[in-house]
Amino acid sequence: MKPQHSTGTLSYTIATYEQVAAILLEDDDDDDDDETDDTNHLVDAVVTCFFIDTATNIYDWVALTHDIVAPGGVWINVGPLQWHRNARLPVTANQLRMILERTGWDILEWSIDPEPIEYRNSQRSTTSGRTAATMSTHFDAYCPLRFVARKP
């Protein structure tokens, strides 16, 4: 892969989720040991934080995650479902749960925080000393989805 960004002697490439999963799933052609199995490159856990709503196609990401997690492994997630512009399938939390279950995940924990969490340096404040006139009436917030799912 050719570096996408460089500064002086430092360069780096940002891989997509699909590229990272492909590395985990690729066969090791140099290994002729018949005692190895298909779970050599699988992981015991995947943790996604403020991530899944960046998917263009969440169905693909759920299937990929299922493919890279070893049997008995878990997927832990926390973050909003504020789908980015490039999302072709912006699903609700309930729809996402159905997708996970139909893909073969067992849901161990599932919750949506009841209180919204503000972000983007909101000007909204309840600090004493600020008048209502100086407080913004607009703020960005989300209620994070938290789940733990296990691959049987």
Give, region by region, the residue ranges found by the protein language model:
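S-adenosyl-L-methionine
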Residues: M1-T39
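Short, contiguous acidic/charged loop-to-helix segments that flank catalytic cores in large enzymes
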Residues: D37-D38, I52-T56, Q82-V91, S136-T137
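Extended, charge-rich low-complexity regions and/or helical-solenoid scaffolds
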Residues: T39-N40, R102-G104, L108, R150-K151
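A short SAM/SAH-binding and catalytic strip from SAM-dependent methyltransferases
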Residues: D44-I58
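A short glycine-rich, Lys/Arg-flanked "PGG" loop and its adjoining helix->strand segment in the class I
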Residues: Y59-P71
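Conserved beta-strand signature within the Rossmann-like core of class I S-adenosyl-L-methionine
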Residues: G72-H84
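Conserved Class I S-adenosyl-L-methionine
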Residues: N86-I117, Q123-R124
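Core SAM-dependent methyltransferase catalytic element
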Residues: T103, Y119-P152
